[in-house]
A protein has these predicted regions:
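ATP-binding N-terminal substructure of ATP-dependent carboxylate-amine bond-forming enzymes
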Residues: 1-168, 201-203, 492-532
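Short, charged, surface-exposed secondary-structure boundary motifs
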Residues: 96-100, 171-178, 286-288
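Active-site nucleotide/adenylate-binding loops and adjacent lid/helix of ATP-dependent enzymes
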Residues: 170-252, 257-258, 269-271, 298-322, ...
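Phosphate-binding site of ATP-dependent enzymes
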Residues: 231-288, 339-347, 400-417, 422-426, ...
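ATP-dependent carboxylate/phosphate-activation module, predominantly the ATP-grasp catalytic core
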Residues: 255-259, 266-319, 352-379
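A long amphipathic alpha-helix within ATP-dependent nucleotide-binding catalytic cores
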Residues: 294-342, 377-406, 411, 497, ...
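Peripheral (often C-terminal) accessory segments that flank ATP-dependent C-N-forming ligase machineries
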Residues: 380-533
Length: 533
């Protein structure tokens, strides 16, 4: 990576700083950053949402979200005092008061999100930033999406509390096969399936026939992003195309159904499982991602599920969440629910035992503003504070509140096979349409919480000037009010006219110098790909 800023980047940083300092964005009424410290912390149990709000608005413990970008939990600092971000990429070029990114970043070929986070934790600039004494003298708490045993060792040595389930447990639960078995134990059934190990196509067919799955099959390996480790096989040609990734390992073979994927996040607390809002998923749109079936965004809208389906899906999430508790898990997780569009059956899809890409929408809902963001319950679970909540009452209220809100996000990946060195990129901030209908940059913004209607959008830049864009690279995330996809008759979801306009408008603001693919190593490509969901 070339970290030398050009003129445009310097100008962007200067303009953003001026805009931030001249608005009330940093200190709006919901922003906990400006709240005063608690005068005396009581240790009696927190029993209602007002007490939870007060607890976090007067929090003195430094909490850091560490990651390639702050995307997943951006805006949580509005509720939680002393919550900030340590990131590899800084879309604000230094102007966000609670985003820290080291200035000196030599080129490194990262192979995973875990490697990025571990590099950040041991970076001297980051250690100096995080070692600043806190008013309370308490150890910093650290959250992130990707971590491993090495992350745990680093945090232990540096004196940080990693407020996440154990890496070993999460790795175990991350298996699609383990999820299927745990779900079956508590009546949270997956799409009709068999779990088998095969070495040839006929074995696959025999097992599918015995399981009543037919010949149009969906095959998944135990680990990996669903967009890259899910294979659609309906004949021997499909088998031969994917057999290298399938042979010799236990796999999940499912009947192919017409389904609508729905995402939901939840938090397993000592009082039970709290279920967040349900969202539809943007998957496999060729304009957004080069990966078939790959996740590329979410939508939350009233009709995402009927009331009956919402209750059944919520019950499925609670049952699986309680089962995870028996495994020793606690805290945040995400579940993909599949709704059979032919029968209205609700199936367990995948478990992501982590903060997910849907978190960005979860924390901005009407339910979050009426109560607190869902992630606040995760924080409580890892704080030394007792609490007693009626989880059933919270879930009932959130079902109603979340069903009335409307938000969408799309993750914009590079879809072209060409490799370019980015020379100009759009600014992070708030955009809107001008009189000619063009999408234009309006002002600096710290997050998307201030968006009011469908004429506005927030763009979070990930790759900027000096970075390479290549097929599959994450360019940025666009968040807006309103829907981004529609279903025409019985066909698959397609992007709306407005979504395509927003997407094209952002893409057109990227310019670059073409490079031959030989000039960019495969390892460099793998490094950037690891930052996907």
């Amino acid at each position: 990576m070339n970290n030398t800023p050009d003129v445009n980047t310097d100008r962007a940083a200067s303009d953003t700083s001026l805009e931030t300092s001249s608005t009330s964005e940093v200190s709006v009424g919901t922003d906990a950053a400006s709240a005063g410290p608690a005068l005396g912390r009581t240790r009696r149990p927190l029993r209602n949402i007002s007490e939870v709000r007060h607890f976090f608005r007067t929090n003195e413990v430094p909490i850091y979200f560490v990651g390639a970008t702050p995307f997943n939990l951006l805006g949580l600092d509005r509720w939680v005092r002393n919550f900030s971000y340590v990131t590899y990429y800084d879309g604000w070029d230094g102007a966000h008061p609670r985003v820290f990114s080291p200035k000196h970043k030599p080129y490194i070929e990262f192979s995973s999100g875990e490697e990025i986070n571990n590099w950040l934790l041991v970076n001297p600039e980051v250690r100096a930033h995080m070692s600043r004494p806190s008013p309370s003298g308490q150890r910093p708490k650290v959250a992130m999406v990707f971590f491993d045993a090495e992350t745990e060792r680093i945090c232990d040595e540096l004196g940080y509390d990693l407020i996440l389930p154990a890496a070993e447990l999460r790795e175990h639960l991350d298996s699609k096969l383990v999820t299927t078995r745990l779900g079956d134990e508590v009546g949270a059934a997956s799409v009709p399936n068999v779990l088998i190990t095969v070495r040839e196509y006929q074995e696959l067919l025999d097992a599918a026939t015995a399981g009543g799955l037919g010949t149009d099959l969906v095959v998944q390996t135990a680990y990996g992003d669903s967009g890259k480790t899910t294979f659609f096989i309906d004949d021997e040609t499909g088998w031969k195309r994917n057999q290298r990734d399938i042979i010799g390992s236990e796999i999940k073979v499912m009947k192919r159904i017409n389904n609508r994927p729905v995402a939901v996040e939840a938090v397993l607390t000592r009082n039970g499982t709290i279920v967040g809002p349900f969202m539809s998923e943007l998957t496999g749109h060729a304009q957004l991602t080069p990966y078939r079936g790959g996740w590329c965004g979410n939508e939350m809208f009233p009709e995402v599920l009927t009331e009956g389906l919402r209750r059944r899906a919520g019950d499925l999430v609670v049952r699986l969440g309680d089962r995870l508790g028996a495994e020793g898990y606690r805290g945040f997780f995400e579940i993909d629910v599949l709704v059979d569009t032919d029968t209205d059956e609700v199936y367990l899809g995948e478990l992501n035992p982590r903060i997910s890409g849907a978190s960005a929408i979860t924390n901005v809902t009407a339910g979050a503003y009426a109560d607190v963001p869902l992630f606040a319950f995760h924080l409580l679970e890892y704080f030394d504070v007792p609490f007693e909540f009626d989880v059933d009452e919270i879930n009932a209220r959130w079902r109603e509140l979340a069903a009335e809100d409307l938000w969408s996000q799309m993750v914009i990946k590079e879809t072209s096979s060409a490799v370019q060195l980015i020379t100009e990129a759009p600014l992070t901030g708030q955009y809107s349409y001008d009189r000619s209908g063009s999408l234009v940059y309006r002002r600096a913004a710290l997050d998307w919480h201030q968006l009011q209607n469908e004429s506005e959008a927030f763009f979070l830049r990930i790759y900027g000037a000096g970075d390479y864009r290549w097929k599959g690279a994450d360019l940025g995330v666009l968040v807006t009010k309103g829907r981004l996809q529609r279903r025409a008759n019985s066909e698959a979801d397609t992007l709306t006219i407005r979504a395509r306009h927003l997407l094209d408008s952002i893409r057109n603001q990227y310019t670059g110098l073409p490079l031959g693919s030989a000039e960019v190593s495969a390892a460099r490509v793998a490094r950037a790909a690891s930052m996907a969901k």
